[in-house]
Amino acid sequence: VEYKSIHKGVMHACGHDAHTAMLLGTAEVLSQLKDKIKGEVRFIFQPAEEGYAGAKFMIADGVIDGVDEIYGMHVWNYQPSGTIGIQDGPVMAAADMFTIKIQGVGGHGAAPQGTVDCVIVASHLIQALQTIVSRNTNPLESTVLSIGQVNGGYNFNIIADEIILRGTTRAYTEKNKQLIKNRMKEIVMGIEKTFSAKIKLDYKDGYPPVVNDKTITKNVERAAKIV
């Protein structure tokens, strides 16, 4: 396709071409039925939805002023073709991201006594962070803390003086979102003191969870059964 990424082998993969076709198709059908519609229907394409607050700018511009209900949908690879996934209450978790910079003292692998080994510090920190989900949050309330990147080191026999960790957290409630964030700060401070390292946590708040209204969800369910 012509609208592919300029970076070879990299794609967003959300299926926004499908979303565009779905919304335009809906607009075409409803425009043919406009005489039967009591009220106003707006069709919204949300820009910059992945972390750049496109919806926030749309709200500021007055796009949803006077809107009583809003419906959105997203393609999903786990959903069988020809079906619609419907759920009231929490359906998508709050998604935050974080970067942790660990600074120590490098040196030769044969003389570790004069160093602050960032690999050791990082390994303890990663293990400690996992206890937030397993020991601090309610097992009945789904939460996730995942570290997807560990970067650092120079060579097989050189003790690393800096390591960068990057990851994400997910929570269905604001309470758990804040709990994870606060515990991360506490654990970072404890590990920093334990190993005499310098650790900086850069935690970026993302979007709040998606919580579907029960009545509106029932409307979608009834319509889906008819279609």
Question: How would you name each of these model-derived features?
Answer:
Residues E2-M11, D17-A18, L23, D35-A160:
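Histidine/acidic-residue-rich, glycine-tolerant segments that coordinate divalent metal ions
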Residues H12-A13, P112, E174-L179:
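Ordered, soluble secondary-structure elements with a strong preference for glycine-centered loop motifs
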Residues L24-L30:
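Histidine-anchored nucleotide/phosphate-binding helix
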Residues V29, D61, G190-I191:
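A generic secondary-structure signal
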Residues Q32-D35, Y172:
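Amphipathic alpha-helical interaction elements
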Residues I120-V227:
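Metal-dependent amide/peptide-bond hydrolase catalytic core
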